[in-house]
């Protein structure tokens, strides 16, 4: 039995697999709200030792004695792999959007697991990408597949922004994690320059993650609100009591307010530009994949051409960029599947 996990700033997903050689479905899987817990250890402890149902009181007058509850047999886990939303160095991971420090060796000792491997969450997603079925991705640009295996790029906007590259070593694809989402945001239009100026009033360093994430979509909306002065009162009221990014996405997709439409236009264009940057830096001729929770929810918007226009807008390299396949990962369990694939190898 192997344990796989995906630790994000919003949700933590854990699962047990009986994975030997090929991908299988999880035997048990649970999703937890990360901010409801003080540490990852608390979540893992609850997952491995779920609360037992209260004993049923015997009904007065019944002669038959109820059978005694049998204690659960201890679960034997051969290996574990956990994807962490943050940098992982020497099997220790600091979550970017949570005050958690995970230590793989300490987890192995506490929970009596022979091996616990921590990966950056995008590295885990990259491993998962290699296990996905065609139906678990959707095409944004068909492109032209190269005759030889070339690098693959992965970019994922969600609570934060993650980036990774997969390179072919002659035998198999090997994921290479990065923290590219924290590099400097580079505007490509007068409007984006104004956005950067607006954000610099709040942040000393404006990274791509400040605009390409759930909070980033909200930041784009606030910029438009403060400069265009076109926020409907009803929308402002909803944003105050609901998830801002979800409200903005819904309003923009349904075209219920101009500011929502404009926010999604700007977000999709910036997303395409940075995905194109990553493709060029890695020469990802075998494809660029969009992971994370935002792309599937904005799929209709990403398919309207604004994303690919920004993606291919690289001057003399426009023709090359147009040849790169681009797909959206629509399976939200890709990181978990990738962690399971790694754990299965560790268990052998």
Regions found by a protein language model. Name each.
Residues 1-54, 69-76, 194-348:
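ATP-binding/phosphotransfer module of carbohydrate and carboxylate kinases, centering on a glycine-rich
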Residues 12, 87-89, 160-164, 219, ...:
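Short, acidic Gly/Pro/Ser/Thr-rich loop/turn segments
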Residues 51-54, 71-118, 123-136, 154, ...:
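Short beta-strand-loop/turn "lid" adjacent to the catalytic site in phosphate-handling enzymes
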Residues 82-86, 157-159, 285-294:
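Glycine-rich beta-strand-to-loop/alpha-helix junction loops that act as flexible
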Residues 133-143, 344-347:
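Short, electropositive alpha-helical surface patch
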Residues 139-142, 147-209, 299-302, 306-312, ...:
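Glycine-rich phosphate-binding loop of actin/hexokinase-like ATP-binding domains
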């Amino acid at each position: 039995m192997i344990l796989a996990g995906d630790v994000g700033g919003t949700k933590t997903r854990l699962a047990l697999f009986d994975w030997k050689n090929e991908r299988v479905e999880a035997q048990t899987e649970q999703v937890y709200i990360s901010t409801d817990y003080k540490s990852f250890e608390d979540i893992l402890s609850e997952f491995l030792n779920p609360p037992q149902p209260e004993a049923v009181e015997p009904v007065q007058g019944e002669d038959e004695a109820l059978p005694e509850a049998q204690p659960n047999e201890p679960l034997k886990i051969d290996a574990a792999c956990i994807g962490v939303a943050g940098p992982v160095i020497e099997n220790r991971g600091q979550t970017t959007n949570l005050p958690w420090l995970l230590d793989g060796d300490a987890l192995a000792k506490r929970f009596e697991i022979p091996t616990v491997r921590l990966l950056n969450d995008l590295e885990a997603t990259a491993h998962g990408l290699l296990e996905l079925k065609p139906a678990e991705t959707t095409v944004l640009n068909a492109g032209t597949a190269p005759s030889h295996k070339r690098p693959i790029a992965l970019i994922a906007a969600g609570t934060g922004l993650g980036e990774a590259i997969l390179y072919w070593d002659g035998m198999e694809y090997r994921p290479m994690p990065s923290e590219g989402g924290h590099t400097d945001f580079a505007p490509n239009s007068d409007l984006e320059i104004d956005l950067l100026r607006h954000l610099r009033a709040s942040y000393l360093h404006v990274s791509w993650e400040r605009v390409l994430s759930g909070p980033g979509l909200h930041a784009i909306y606030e910029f438009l609100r403060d400069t265009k002065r076109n926020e409907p009162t009803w929308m402002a009221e909803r944003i105050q009591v609901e998830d801002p990014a979800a409200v903005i996405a819904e309003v923009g997709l349904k075209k219920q307010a101009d500011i929502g439409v404009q926010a999604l236009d700007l977000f999709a264009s910036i997303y395409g530009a940075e995905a194109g940057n990553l493709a060029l830096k890695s020469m990802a001729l075998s494809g660029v994949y969009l992971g994370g929770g935002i792309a599937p929810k904005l799929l209709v918007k990403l398919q309207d051409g604004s994303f690919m226009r920004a993606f291919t807008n690289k001057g003399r390299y426009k023709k090359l960029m147009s040849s790169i396949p681009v797909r959206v990962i629509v399976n939200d369990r890709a990181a978990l599947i990738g962690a399971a694939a790694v754990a299965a190898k560790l268990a052998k």
